[in-house]
Amino acid sequence: MKITISREDFNKIYEHALSVRPEEACGLIAGEDRDSGIRVIEKVYILTNTDHTNEHFTIDPKEQLTAIKDMRANGLKPLGNWHSHPESPSRPSEEDKKLANDSKASYLILSLMEEGNPVLNAFHIELKNGEKTVRKEELLII
């Protein structure tokens, strides 16, 4: 699947991730799936990582509920989540794979490993034959 995110939303995620580093930053993504097969991110939600650690994240449940209500009020579809890896590459960790339970979701991971060179990738994670499989999705910053 091809996914698009605006430069403005990319910058919003990046700036927040820098502001909470060395902790992982996290949030949700919302938008629409177009008939053309393109997933369009129309809004990103910056949410609190209640774990306050650089190794994993848990989204604040109250903030998550507020974000879901906002999506519904604005006619947006929940598309998945995003989080940062302050000290590791932009790919799902074993923990990320273990916690990925929505086969329809896109998982965006922003690496801050290389100073001044943020790397954002999108992934699809699903259970196949008893194992979690990861597929990189095409992500366009427009």
Feature locations, PLM:
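Conserved beta-strand-loop surface patch within small alpha/beta domains used
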Residues: M1-P78, E87-I142
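Short, well-ordered beta-to-alpha junction loops that form the rim of enzyme active sites
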Residues: S84
